[in-house]
Amino acid sequence: MKKIFTVIFIFIFTSTAFCEVNKKTVLRAWKNITRAENFSELPMNFESDDEPNAWVAYGDDGDYSVHVTTSLMKILESENEIAGVLAHELGHIQLGHYNNFALSDTVRAIMGANLERADDLAQAVGNINLELKESKFSREQETEADNYGVKVLVKANYSAWGLYNAMKRFDENDLGTEANGFNSHPASKERLANLANQARNQSQENHREKNKDNNNNKKDNIDSLADILMGY
């Protein structure tokens, strides 16, 4: 009986850890990530593209939208991994990395426009549609978004190793050579080492917090029991 239970447990564990990443998985992960940060859930768009990628777009209406390619879903193997990618992208938004691109693109539009009237200026600015898929972040910004992403993963009750494992998929498939979106930079040894270090630290911190909560709960239970006994 014990052997049967062990087999069932292993099956359940592996089936949840390694599952197909489909649209429903992506939407659920995005909802959990944004909820953990009290961030308004942005529209999610799925793109049929041979390039595994994820990025944020900035529309004429001033709103962000998130884009994930079907190829990305194919190479990832768990909800933890897609959650890591989405947490990384949210990091770029929350840390203000897109603001610089928006400002520089506005300046380029104004400088390059034939401004004969004030209306031309308004039109030049109004017609800007930033395809932030083409954004090129610095290594410092990528590291900041990575560190942010790992923290949010734990906060949303995902594995701290989700983003690290996602980057490993890119590395194993020789991806990350296109200068845009999530795969802006190859999964270098330094970047993977930093992600592993962040994941370990967050896992340990999360473990300490849980132990602290458990100890506090035990103390509360003992105090409650003492109060009951004192009442007799």
Residues covered by each model-derived region:
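Sec-dependent N-terminal signal peptides
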Residues: I4-T14
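Peri-catalytic and regulatory segments of divalent metal-dependent proteins
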Residues: F18-T106, K151, K155-Y158, E172-G176, ...
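Surface-exposed, interaction-prone regions with an acidic/low-complexity signature
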Residues: L115-A118, V125, R191-Y232
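Post-HEXXH active-site segment of zinc metalloproteases
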Residues: Y98-N127
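Metalloprotease/metallohydrolase-associated module, dominated by Zn2+-dependent proteases
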Residues: K31, A118-M167, R191
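Long, well-structured alpha-helical subdomains associated
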Residues: S138, S159-N215
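Active-site metal-coordination segments of metallo-dependent hydrolases
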Residues: E20-L27, L95-N100, L130-Y148, F182-K189
